[in-house]
Amino acid sequence: AAVIQDPAAREDENITATENAVSALGKLCEHQTQSIDAKSIFPSFLACLPLTEDAIEARAVHAQLARLLQNDTYKSYLLGENNENLARAILIFAEVMPTASSSDKVRLCDQETAMAMKNTLVQMQSTMPGDALAAAFSALDPQKQAALQACMA
């Protein structure tokens, strides 16, 4: 966690190591949940996303996020009590899902992951309190709202 939280973590000479550390943290969340303080580590992992510099790690970690959000136990750790991290998760989806007008995002998320994210959003629409989801979407700027709407079409 110290590597990820270091003030210099996002500087050019450190970004690859930082994104690899975030990837490792995600693997701990997914595969060693019982060995970590899940209520604090999962939100810390979410706060580090999206990955933007290492395309290989970005695709793997964003696919992992989609998997985690499709599992009720992991989802509860990621989103937190009262879905306090829901807006963050939706913002990440908006930033990484490819759209016709954002070809640079294609490298952050493959089509399979984009479909999993879309399915997760559809599932959230039917299972989460409407006011929580509406608040999360309204927290997005208009461009990100439009990007998500385009992905959902």
Predicted regions and their residues:
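Alpha-solenoid helical-repeat scaffold
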Residues: A1-A153
